[in-house]
Regions:
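Periplasmic/cell-envelope proteins involved in peptidoglycan metabolism and beta-lactam response
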Residues: 1-294, 303-306, 315, 337-343, ...
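Beta-lactam-recognizing serine transpeptidase/beta-lactamase-like catalytic domain environment
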Residues: 2-6, 12, 74, 219-229, ...
């Protein structure tokens, strides 16, 4: 009993001590709080009014872009923007007047920028003018005290070293739009951020975009920096190395000067794009700062559509280049053999309609090889009649026509390989047998992009390797990996089918065929020309002075016959005959490629072969 009473007294004693300690601590805290608020409060208010923390965004440079041989294509240059810190504004009307009158910003533009700035948040500065001149910098510096809310902010700007060269591949950057922010097209972006708008700048925007840093400084109420608090450095974006070869790209651009068309060169074995030029073009440097409304309207209203990449975003009838795919269909279906011959008199009647060959007097009796060499229409009209449109379409699709290639560039078109079902679905009309005859020589409803045609012919060159074209070679960044899904599909097509087609293509270039203007001494170039009729002969006479009625020009080929290393397609809108207009363009690309190869081999001879040589 006594023990219980003793424990009870001990408990109450400890409780009293604990309560006493709590009371003492409370009194100490209350005293300190009273001191801070009453005694020292005015001093802290004064300091808070005099000094504020300002967070300055350190914009991360985008990653650089180079060609396959490390030739720089896209870099960054130093630039300054004029920034408005809204939390530092004392007199809004005075600030607006200063920005408009002294810095030359239109009132309506400033209103838009201020409205968009509200979306970004109060403590994110509004960019009121980009990439400013020395004169603007001088004005800001001279008015620092009167307008501390206006500051200069460094920002790296995109610089495309060679102007319009490879513009459609590289693309350009621009300010993220409100719609793109709402759609989360570029996650994590805010108004004022620059993002890729086209080309690899867009496709690999995430790889190229770095991580912004920040600097925290102490500023006075008039905006003068009085102390440094902390800094987190910006992290530069990943570097891209492309598959392009600068020399081939430059040559393709020069060959297209003053023309409307495209030239694409590709490694047929793996789909690496060595050159992709489209004309007319544009200078992406004009987008590095906000492009003027006048310049933008001029670009989008240009009837030749310079922003369009004709390699992948336009589709055209393939003309006589489609005869290669017709040959593949005929051979695979067993409708062509060594003994298959057709007599060409210059014209022929099919389904009660008269169809003509391009050679009025005819080619006489021709087999498959000669029909490719001479590009005889009558042979392929007859082959089309035997095959029918469904078999023609099936083999064309198998070789990659009429569908996107999957290239790592935006805006690629499908093209069309027509069938009766397609016509019914898209036009609500019946397929006529005569349409099959037109399709058999690449006319009528069929259309392909130049890259699709190049990919299909590359499959012929490599005995059935259907590649996925791409422009990215590698990404250099610790956190990014180079895509490795450049799949190659091996087509189930007989080797003899490809051999016989290549025999005809070789003869077209090297045996007085329509592609002879692509021939290079010492190199077995294989190719096929195409000339696409834009308007009927009856109307042609009425409009003979109009350039828009001229035929489209094609040439597609590869080299060499037994060791395909490069495939080239050249296309000119309204260029005339393919053998005259397009074939010489391809020849120049082939010539540069093999000249470079010879220089490399001379500089770095094969040591193994040299060691095996005997006197």
């Amino acid at each position: 009993m006594k023990a219980q009473e003793s424990n009870k007294q001990l408990f109450h004693l400890r409780l009293n001590w604990t309560l006493g300690l709590v009371v003492v601590l409370f009194l100490v805290l209350a005293s300190r709080l009273w001191q801070l608020q009453v005694i020292q409060g005015p001093e802290y208010v004064r300091l808070a009014e005099q000094n504020r923390v300002r967070t300055i965004q350190l914009v991360a440079p985008r990653g650089t872009i180079s060609d396959r041989n490390n030739v720089p294509l896209v870099e960054n240059r130093s630039a300054f923007n004029i920034l408005l810190y809204r939390e530092s504004i004392k007199d809004m009307e005075a600030t607006k007047q200063y920005v408009v009158e002294k810095l030359g910003v239109k009132p309506e533009d400033l209103a838009v920028k201020m409205r968009r700035g509200k979306v970004a948040g109060l403590y994110r500065p509004v960019v009121v003018k980009e990439d400013v001149s020395i004169d603007d910098i001088s004005v800001v510096e001279a008015h620092k005290r009167q307008h501390p809310e206006i500051q200069l902010g460094p920002e790296p700007r995109r610089h495309y070293r060679h102007g319009s060269l490879a513009a459609h591949v590289l693309g350009y950057v621009g300010e993220v739009s409100e719609d793109e922010i709402l759609r989360e097209a570029f996650p994590g972006t805010a108004p004022g951020d620059l993002v890729g708008k086209s080309g690899v700048e867009r496709v690999y925007n995430q790889n190229l975009t770095g991580t912004d840093g920040k600097r925290e400084v102490l500023v006075t109420s008039v905006g003068r920096e009085v102390g440094f608090l902390d800094e987190m450095e910006a992290q530069v974006g990943g570097e891209l190395q492309l598959t392009l070869d600068f020399d081939l790209q430059e040559a393709a651009e020069k060959l297209l000067a003053g023309k409307v068309g495209t030239i694409v060169a590709m490694d047929p074995t793996n789909g690496e794009i060595l050159a992709m030029a489209s004309a007319p073009s544009f200078d992406p440097n004009s987008f590095s700062t906000r492009i003027s409304e006048q310049d933008w309207n001029q670009l989008i209203n240009d009837p030749n559509r310079p922003l369009q990449n004709r390699s992948i975003q336009n589709s055209y009838p393939p003309g006589s280049t489609f005869k290669l795919f017709m040959a593949a269909a005929g051979l695979e279906e067993g409708m062509i053999s060594e003994s298959t011959h057709v007599y060409c008199s210059g014209s022929g009647v099919f389904y009660n309609h008269l169809f003509h060959c391009h050679k009025k007097e005819g080619h006489g009796t021709v087999g498959l090889e000669q029909s490719i060499i001479k590009s005889c229409n009558i042979f392929f009209y007859e082959l089309g009649r035997r095959l029918g449109i469904d078999k023609i379409a099936g083999h064309a699709l198998e070789l990659g026509l009429g569908e996107r290639t999957g290239i790592d560039l935006p805006g690629e078109r499908n093209g069309v390989v027509p069938t009766p079902e397609w016509k019914q679905q898209t036009r609500g009309a019946k397929w006529f047998a005569g349409e099959t005859i037109s399709v058999s020589i690449g006319q009528g409803s069929i259309s392909v992009t130049p890259l699709q045609l190049l990919r299909g012919v590359s499959a012929i060159a490599t005995n059935g390797r259907l590649t996925k074209p791409h422009v990215l070679l590698r990404v250099e960044h610790p956190n990014d990996e180079t895509p490795s899904d450049w799949k190659v599909l091996q087509l189930p097509v007989a080797a003899d089918t490809f051999k016989r087609i290549k025999d005809g293509m070789w003869g077209s270039v090297n045996n007085s065929g329509t592609g002879h203007n692509a021939a290079i001494p010492g190199v077995d170039i294989c190719g096929k020309t195409g000339t696409v009729q834009v308007i009927g002969n009856d109307r042609r006479k009425e409009m003979k002075k109009d350039l828009a009625i001229e035929d489209h020009s094609w040439f597609v080929g590869f080299g060499s016959r037994d060791n395909p290393e490069i495939a080239v397609v050249a296309f000119l809108e309204h260029g005339g005959m393919g053998g005259i207009a397009a074939a010489p363009l391809a020849r120049e690309i082939f010539s540069i490629f093999y000249a470079k190869k010879q220089r490399r081999e001379t500089a770095h001879p094969d040591v193994t072969q040299l060691s095996e040589a005997r006197p």
